[in-house]
Design a protein with these regions (language model features):
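Glycine-rich adenosine-cofactor-binding loop
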Residues: 25, 118-121, 128-129, 134-156, ...
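Short glycine-rich anion-binding loops that position phosphate/pyrophosphate groups of nucleotides
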Residues: 79-86, 144-145, 207-212, 280, ...
């Protein structure tokens, strides 16, 4: 089993004959919730199977999957940011719903073949269940995590206008084409233009900005929990160790700009609803500020739980939705 570690940036201790599942991503060991949720169910079932976080570099994904295809004890598992789109080209089969959404968050191994599925769509439907009719919706981000959220929103709010904030307009156009979005939508690349639009009724953050996790890039670290999606993260300054005060001090100017952008955004904007698909922390900086200004907020916990239940069912061939949900929530 030690051979698995050749492809990872973290070290896993898995017994030689133990069946296991993985959550594959850049740094799932730094805060992914799925291992805790899945392992609660495995323990309740008195199973020896466990889920582990697999931190993988982009250039090692193909090698890892080739190894897992021939790894008899690997069952499948989850895929998290930022590989939900990239990983598709290395899989043998893609479920038709995942193909339409254009991203994969679940892998199932059958014999020596790996198949991709997407359960984020079900999670997205759960996340927006309490959100009522909307006139104009602002979507922040257009990555793999955004796709199922956008699909569920455009299906529920068919008469709403959508504003996409993303620096790459072609990415949005391709996404709209692939998801067959019929809604009226605009693309805004400039943050200043977003700050000047007054009549949003719902703001949805599908980016990872706000997530509490130390990320390593070129031997240096940064954490996105201190920022909102209104930050210019191109200017972020990294540090050599997980020193929170040092990181904040080094990014004073960026944090100040972020604060000014937030203040401008919330000025004269009452009664906006905010959905942030991030679940760690429960209240991101964006949600805390939105709540402070008296707006209704929703986090990504329900979305994350629902997708985890559905993924567990697919990988482990189980139909016990209520049992799995109960064990994931109650830890017993």
């Amino acid at each position: 089993m030690n051979y698995l570690n050749h492809f990872l940036n973290n070290r896993l201790k898995i017994k030689k004959e133990s069946k296991y599942s993985l959550i594959i991503g850049e740094t799932p060991s730094k805060g992914a919730r799925s291992p805790k949720l899945w392992n609660r169910v495995y323990k309740a079932q008195k199973s020896k199977i466990r889920m582990y976080p697999a931190d993988v570099s982009k250039n090692n994904i193909n090698n890892l999957l080739r190894f897992l295809k021939n790894e008899k004890n690997y069952l499948g598992g989850s895929v998290t940011a930022p590989y939900k789109v990239l990983i598709m080209k290395y899989l043998d089969n893609i479920d038709k719903n995942a193909k339409k959404i254009g991203s994969v968050n679940t892998i199932v191994k059958n014999k020596n073949k790996l198949s991709g599925f997407n359960t984020d769509f079900f999670g997205s439907l759960e996340a927006i269940k309490k959100i009522k009719k909307q006139k104009k919706i602002l979507i922040l981000g257009a990555g793999g995590a955004a796709r199922p959220v956008i699909l569920s929103l455009t299906k529920k709010f068919k008469n709403s206008e959508f504003i996409f904030y993303n620096r790459n307009s072609n990415k949005i156009k391709n996404l709209a084409k692939e998801l067959e979005i019929k809604n009226n939508f605009k693309i805004i690349k400039n943050l200043k233009h977003i700050l000047n639009i007054k009549d949003f009724s719902l703001v949805v953050n599908t980016t990872s900005v706000g997530f509490d996790s130390w990320v390593k890039k070129n031997k240096e670290l940064f954490n996105l929990k201190f920022f909102t999606p209104f930050s210019n993260l191109i200017k972020i300054k990294k540090i050599k160790s997980k020193n929170q005060s040092k990181f904040i001090n080094k990014n004073k100017e960026l944090l100040m700009t972020d604060r000014m952008n937030i203040k401008k955004f919330f000025l004269n904007r009452p009664n906006i609803e905010f959905l942030d698909i991030i679940y760690n922390p429960k209240k991101t900086k964006l949600l805390k500020i939105a709540e402070f200004y008296g707006n209704k907020i929703y986090n990504g916990l329900e979305m994350n739980l629902t997708q985890a239940i559905k993924s567990f069912m697919i990988v482990n061939k189980s139909n016990s939705y209520n049992f799995i949900k109960k064990k994931m929530i109650n830890n017993g």
